[in-house]
Amino acid sequence: AIGSFYLIVFAVIAAAVYSSTSIRYVRILSLGSSWLFLGLITLMWAGAFLSEGSSVGEFFTTFALLGDYFVNLHNFILPINDYHEFYLYWWFAWSIMIGQFTARFVSGIKTYQVLAAMMIFPSIPIGIWFTVLYYYSANAIPVTGISNLAMVFVGTTFVINSLDSLVRLYTDNLNLTVKRFGKTKYFIGNVALLSGLTLLFKLDFLQIQWVGALAIGLILGCFGYILLAHYRKVVEIKNSPKENKIDFNKIELVN
C-alpha cells in the first residue's frame, strides 16, 4: 500500500513537471480541470436530486442551509484551534505562489475585478459542490462506481494543475527554464527536486507550520522593503503596463 502511494505521488509530480514545460500545457490543464469539476458537480448533482425518491426542490432546500454558515460564522472563527492554525499556515504557504502567478495574468484588471474573479465567482460552484456532498452524507447515499472514479480523477487533476503552476513559477524566477537546460534535464531535475522535498515532509522538522511562518516573514519583509525603498514609485502606478498583457494566441503559435 505504501509503495502504491509513493508511485502515485511520483506519477503526479512527473505529470506536473511535464505540464510546466509549456505555458500552453498549463493553460489547457487549468481550463480542463475547471470543466472537469463542473462536469463532476453535474454528475453528482444528477445522482442525488434526479434519482428515485428525491427531487430538484430538495437541492434548493439544502442549498439554502449555506446561509446558516454566515449566521454562525463567529462560531467557526473563535476560539482558534489546531484546525485554524493548519489551514492558515497552509494558506500563507501557498499565497506567495498564487499571488505572483496570478499577477502575471491580470494585466488591466482592477482590484475589485480580481477579487470577484478569484473569490466571489468560484464560490458559487463550490457552494453547489458542498451542497451536493452534504446531501449525499445526510442521506447516506453511497458514492461508488463511476462517481467515485470521477472524484479521484478530478481531484488528481487539480493537484497536477496546482503543482505545474508552482513549478513554472519558480523555474522562471530562478532561470531554471526549458530553454536554458533542455526539456530532458529540466524534467529530471525538477522531478528529483520535488520528490526529495516530498520525502522531507515525512520528517518531523519540516512541517506546514514552519513553511507558513517562513512565508509570513517573507511577505512582511517584502512589504516593509517596498514601503521604505519604493513607496513613491508604487503609489504612482495607475495600471499594468501594456507590454504585460499576455496574448495566448501568440503562445499557441510558438508552441
Labelled PLM ranges:
Residues 108-115, 130-149, 165, 169-181, ...:
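Terminal cytosolic tails of multi-pass membrane transporters
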Residues 1, 10-33, 101-111, 201-208, ...:
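Membrane-water interface regions at transmembrane-helix termini and the short interhelical loops
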Residues 1-7, 101-124, 166-191:
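Helix-loop-helix connectors at the membrane interface of multi-pass transporters/channels
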Residues 1-5, 38-68, 224-239:
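Hydrophobic alpha-helical segments and their helix-loop junctions in multi-pass secondary transporters
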Residues 74-116:
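A conserved active-site cap/scaffold subdomain adjacent to cofactor or substrate pockets
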Residues 20-46, 116-119, 208-223:
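Membrane-interface loop-to-helix entry segments
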Residues 138-144, 199-216:
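Extracellular/periplasmic helix-loop-helix junctions in multi-pass membrane proteins
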Residues 1-22, 88-100, 150-153, 183-201:
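Transmembrane alpha-helical segments of multi-pass small-molecule transport proteins
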